Amino acid sequence: MGVMGLAHALYLRGHAFASPEAVEFNDEAMEAIAYYAYEASADLAAERGTYSSYKGSKWDRGLLPQDTIDLLEKERGVAVDVPRGGKMDWTPLRAKIAKQGMRNSNCLAIAPTATISNITATSPCIEPTYKNLFVKSNLSGEFIVLNPFLVKDLKARGLWDQDMIDNLKYFDGELKDIERIPADLKAKYLTAFDIDAKWILDAAARRQKWIDQAQSVNLWIKTPDLKTLSHMYRHAWHVGLKTTYYLRSLGAVSYTH
């Protein structure tokens, strides 16, 4: 099982991607997904038996993914900077797994979902919004598509008019130079290249403690440099991430535009 639509969920909850509230939501949502996925696998094990190499596994030894942070910390000899614990009572599920075992060796992995998220009209996996404005092409030609959540919020504030449409087109969907847009909406609709990677990594670390496999975590930097990359990847290591995926950057032409 994976995840997609995180950015849209945050819009609906009114949280900026780069915010403590968003980090907490990642933690709580992933905990709930993990709990019920692992419970379903334990129920399947009671019905059909455990997977072939279950004996001696971490599941068999009573270790859930969140428990392995302490193992990682002990192996490294350095603190893993991620809060332990969660909102749910895992005691009944631990007892169920101890009694019934697990049908699946791995239950959760967050894939990129770039294609299927388009089909289902939601945001890809756990990524921030890439752009608030983009151009789609079909047999009839090209047409502009705006972030529908942004449009809804602008209408609710009485800011949706032809001047706003023209400004959004002129600034390619970027909000920071449009004076009429309030600061809270600018924060809420920051796009991937304007979000500090620390927020992406902290949210990923909160998800990772519940995930038994791994996740596709892309990072965005407009103009990478050695110092920034060093700090970014060291932070990823300190918060216990298993992996990161692509590092996205802007070409010189895109950046100056």
Task: Describe each PLM feature range.
Residues 4-6, 39, 148-149:
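A generic alpha-helix surface/boundary motif
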Residues 1-13:
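Core structural elements
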Residues 1, 15-113, 216, 232:
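Internal maturation/activation junctions in enzymes
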Residues 257:
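Residue-level detector of conserved catalytic or cofactor/ligand-binding positions
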Residues 2-5, 49, 125, 173:
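Glycine-centered flexibility motif
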Residues 83-87, 96-254:
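Catalytic alpha/beta core of large soluble enzyme barrels
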